[in-house]
Amino acid sequence: RKMSNHYIVNYPDHPKRTESALYRQTRKKLKFMPCFICDRVNVEGEQSNEIHHFYIEKVAASAIDWIKFGEFAQECFHLQTGENIGKKFDWKEVEKNPEIFVDSPENMIVLCKKHHTGRIGIHHVPFPDWILQKFAVKDFQFVVGET
């Protein structure tokens, strides 16, 4: 079935996105972790896997109720490591400086370009359809891009 979605996302006013020191540390720490969907790994000297802000996009940080999110996060686990994310943070401190969480490894998943920003990536495919790609039987494609 062919499907098309059109919608408008309303983000709060925010400064131009820059890479924080924490983001750079996070990217370095995760660079050899495999793609969450297809298990593709980077090889030495290559950086084709990327990190994706999973729970909270950086541009949305100023419009998040961090105390409410912190309560929710107590029961959340990182998709790739299985570690609880909520207990690692002082959410009152995150409320003062959201970057503490937003650019941390706990808010990131590692994706290859195809499953991140490609036609079948998380930035283009609704999550319920995107996640199916992780569990497909061999040689079956749930999301095929444009036909």
What are these regions (language model features)?
Residues 20-85, 112-114:
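Short cysteine-rich loop/turn motifs with clustered Cys
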Residues 60-66, 70-147:
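Polybasic, low-complexity binding patches
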